[in-house]
Amino acid sequence: MRVLVWNMNKQKRAWDYLRGHAKEFDVALLQETRDPRLMADPRWSSVVWRPKAGPPGSPRTLWGSAVIAPSLELEGYEPNEAFPWLGELAGSVAVARSSGSPTWFASLHTHASPVPQAVLDLHSWADAPLCAPNGTVWEQDLIPFELHRLFAGETFLWGGDLNSAEAMDDLGFVGGNRRLREIWREAGSRDLRGRFCTEEQQTFFRPNRRPYQLDHVFADPLTESRVLDWRVDTPAVAATPAFSDHAPIVVELERCN
């Protein structure tokens, strides 16, 4: 099984790239994608999309997160009251369930700024472990916290543009990115890069910006043990013009019998 994880930067051209490589992946976790129901090949089996709303008072949808599969049957997950943040932060996360393994797939695009207080007041977050030394609450705290509760006891794979890199902690950011990894590992997630690259690998290629790895993929230990390859697919950003300012991550898993 091959999984592609990609922030498409809202580019229509990115869909040309994705459709052209459809035979090379089984599941794609997409972020900053236009409505995939309008862009995907209509023959594809599964399209799960969670849009972000436009500005307050506007019915316009900007973009969203998606889980798609050309031939694998997936069922979109609709959060209930037990997972208020997965519902409240829709568009930052799309979740799908499979009858195979991994059982769960989730595509995340977490914000690069704290959750506003007006939003925090909507639901309890008291049980979520926080990463930032200054006590601010981030989507990176809330969404994986609820995902791990949802996934409990089942296999899973989640990832996307997390707007987080360990290297940020060394450059005057608010901090807490390394602590995030500790929290996620304690909750049962393993970074799928770990067996292939000891250091973070650049996935963000916007001109005049630091070369961070903002995109990451995690899974439960059993799924992690099936990983055959993890790599950054640089041709998507090497094209002129580039298909996106993020390069996809491709993860290859040994298929289950």
Residue spans for each PLM region:
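Short glycine-/acidic-enriched loop or helix-start segments at secondary-structure transitions
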Residues: 15, 37-41, 45-47, 117, ...
